[in-house]
């Protein structure tokens, strides 16, 4: 994360906004401030790169369920509003790095129609060319959304 924040390349060379989500309280305050400044400086594109740190899909679902029960509500659209990711669209694609083929407690509810791409490369070492390859593959997929 430190290396990523130190790079200037992500500020201008990519056609997407960068947003960090999750519990950032474990990070040094200076780093959180840098993250917030980066997010403010990247609001020009419709495309988004959303980086979740210290996020648990299970915790998110449990917290949303507790809120629903407390408010005596049972509706899928309202349930989604109680999730921490409520203002984030469900991901169209997910790149899983490090050679793992599991979700690892990430976005358990939100990935029902997400296309997955896998690489053995660890995230800090994933190259722009690999990401572009996955994006090109993604655009070749006929998405059916459960139909």
What kind of feature is each model-predicted range?
Residues 1-147:
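Flexible, compositionally biased loop and terminal segments
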């Amino acid at each position: 994360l430190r290396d990523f924040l130190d790079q200037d390349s992500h500020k201008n060379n990519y056609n997407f906004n960068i947003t960090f989500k999750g519990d950032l309280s474990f990070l040094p305050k200076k780093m959180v401030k840098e993250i917030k400044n980066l997010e403010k400086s990247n609001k020009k594109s419709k495309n988004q790169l959303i980086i979740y740190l210290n996020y648990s899909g299970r915790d998110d679902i449990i917290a949303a369920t507790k809120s629903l029960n407390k408010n005596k509500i049972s509706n899928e659209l309202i349930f989604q509003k109680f999730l921490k990711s409520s203002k984030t669209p469900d991901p169209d694609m997910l790149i899983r790095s490090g050679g793992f083929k599991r979700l690892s407690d990430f976005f358990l509810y939100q990935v029902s129609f997400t296309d997955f791409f896998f690489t053995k490369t660890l995230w800090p070492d994933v190259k722009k060319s690999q990401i572009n390859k996955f994006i090109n593959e993604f655009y070749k997929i006929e998405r059916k959304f459960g139909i």
